């Protein structure tokens, strides 16, 4: 079970959230059998979608994150509900690329550094909200940070 910690200042002007998504990523790895670098990419997107899902107001609301980059993993997508339950997939789950020179997984090499991050929020009503930003780095966290810095929450 993934663990989430949410903190709110007493005047409700600042909110922080942290998540241990180890179990969720392990389950995705068990289901999809991706390579290590795609597991990292999918895990990052699952975690982000789950955290964004928890912030949704309606019980039937959902958020979809779709990363369409120019890397060999192809499209990586994750969908989460308002309880933080998430599921996802990578178009090409097995990508074998060398580690970075620092010994870390090359997530940006797998997903690509050029492309788009799409965020779709469905509140079950009229048209879903769809926003998008160009990829900044392909490291996923930086791309989502860029998106969040550009929208007005």
Model segments located where?
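Long, charged interaction segments in nuclear RNA/chromatin-associated proteins
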Residues: 135, 139-140, 145
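Gly-rich Lys/Arg/Thr-decorated short loops/hinges at beta-loop-alpha junctions or inter-strand turns
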Residues: 125
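Conserved small/polar residues in nucleotide/adenosyl-binding loops
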Residues: 151-153
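N-terminal functional module of multi-domain proteins
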Residues: 2-120, 129
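Alpha-helical scaffold segments in soluble metabolic enzymes
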Residues: 48-51, 143-147
